[in-house]
């Protein structure tokens, strides 16, 4: 894949690893909260994550820790359609986490990679290399096999993941486009994504009755200190995940952000088979998962190896004499 400006290798690797680690953490935190502790509303959890992001960035700007443009009439034009994509990505991701076992959740999420690759080509004019296409093909092929033989199939859960994949792909590509424009910066994108969608999200939570269910649960004996800790950790992780996603997209491509971390996929996939208790083993399904994981590893190797090689060679000025055009050590 090609890019006009590339960040240093350490920035690209660190941001990708950071995003991968936080992605692992929040998947397990949300899964424990929604499935193990049976918190009744993933929509309410999403609102909590949005409010945490708004409050953290508001006070960080107040104390001059971060900077981003103040709200004015030009902000909606500069940021759209990111808030809508962010909201649907958040809600569908939480819903899928609640309804699908972790191994299948991570495998099905890889379909967003193909969608991202297509959107990058049409919106950002970024063309994937042959090696990248092969690795993506392995990920998608393995995911397809695993999905066919998933014994715990949930139609609504699969629909949630499909919506999540579309939103993830579009969110990554448009985030890259907005970051390149440098109008709002990393923190501005995060703050206004949440601010513009907070009221609509609250309306949805109220309309669906999730607000009453969450409120009743939080006043009951089921809301133990462990559940409170998990809920607050989920809200904070939502902010950190947003930051790590924007940071990774800034230093890498949108496709790399979507594909990030075979370690994340390995860890979540295999540990999730035992930790969540809702995975049903089947050999064909297990084989498909492993093929998809191998594709993830291959993609990461190809991406960072090719980018590292590309950044090492710089064209010499055309005006230099021929005798100085010698290879550099």
From Swiss-Prot:
User: What happens on changing residue 151 to P?
Assistant: In n2844; F1 adults accumulate eggs in the uterus. Embryos are predominantly arrested at the bean/comma embryonic stage
Pfam families per record: TPT (PF03151)
Q: Name one GO cellular component term.
A: cytoplasm
Going by the UniProt record, its keywords in alphabetical order are: Golgi apparatus, Membrane, Sugar transport, Transmembrane, Transmembrane helix, Transport
Principal place of residence: Golgi
**What is the annotated localization of this protein?**
Golgi apparatus membrane
The stretch of residues making up the signal peptide is none
The molecular function terms in GO held by this entry are:
antiporter activity; UDP-galactose transmembrane transporter activity; UDP-glucuronate transmembrane transporter activity; UDP-N-acetylgalactosamine transmembrane transporter activity; UDP-N-acetylglucosamine transmembrane transporter activity
Source domain of life: Eukaryota
Keyword set includes Protease: no
Query: What function does this protein fulfil?
Result: Acts as a transporter of UDP-glucuronic acid (UDP-GlcA), UDP-N-acetylgalactosamine (UDP-GalNAc) and UDP-galactose (UDP-Gal) from the cytoplasm into the Golgi lumen. Involved in the biosynthesis of glycoconjugates that play a pivotal role in development. Involved in the synthesis of chondroitin sulfate and heparan sulfate proteoglycans. Required for embryonic development. Involved in vulva epithelium invagination and embryonic development. Involved in the directed migration of hermaphrodite-specific neurons.
* UniProt name for this protein: UDP-sugar transporter sqv-7
The source organism is Caenorhabditis elegans
């Amino acid at each position: 894949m090609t890019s006009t400006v590339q960040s240093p290798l350490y920035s690209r690797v660190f941001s990708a690893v950071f995003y991968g680690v936080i992605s692992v953490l929040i998947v397990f935190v949300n899964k424990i909260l929604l499935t193990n502790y049976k918190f009744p509303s993933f929509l309410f959890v999403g609102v909590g994550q949005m409010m945490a992001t708004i409050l953290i960035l508001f006070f960080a700007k107040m104390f001059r820790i971060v900077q981003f443009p103040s709200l004015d009439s030009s902000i909606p034009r500069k940021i759209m359609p990111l808030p809508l994509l962010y909201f649907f990505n958040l809600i569908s991701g939480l819903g899928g986490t609640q309804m699908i076992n972790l191994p299948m959740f991570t495998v099905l999420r890889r379909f967003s990679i193909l969608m991202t690759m297509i959107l990058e080509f049409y919106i950002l004019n970024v063309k994937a290399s042959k090696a990248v296409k092969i690795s993506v093909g392995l990920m998608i092929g393995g995911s397809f096999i695993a999905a066919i033989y998933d014994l715990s199939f949930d139609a609504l859960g699969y629909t949630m993941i499909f919506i999540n994949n579309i939103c993830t792909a579009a969110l990554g590509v448009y985030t890259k486009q907005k970051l390149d424009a440098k109008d709002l910066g990393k923190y501005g994108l995060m703050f206004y994504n949440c601010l513009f969608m907070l009221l609509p999200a609250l309306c949805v939570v109220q309309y669906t009755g999730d607000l009453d269910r969450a409120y009743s649960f939080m006043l009951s004996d089921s809301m133990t200190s462990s559940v409170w800790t998990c809920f607050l950790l989920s809200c904070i992780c939502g902010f950190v995940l947003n930051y790590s996603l924007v940071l990774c997209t800034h230093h890498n491509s949108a496709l790399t952000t979507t594909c990030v971390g075979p370690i994340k996929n390995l860890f979540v996939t295999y540990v999730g088979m035992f930790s969540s208790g809702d995975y049903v083993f089947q050999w064909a399904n297990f084989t498909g998962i492993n093929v998809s994981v191998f594709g993830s590893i291959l993609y990461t190797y190809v991406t960072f190896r090719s980018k590292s090689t590309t950044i090492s060679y710089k064209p010499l000025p055309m005006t230099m004499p021929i005798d100085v055009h010698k290879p550099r050590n």
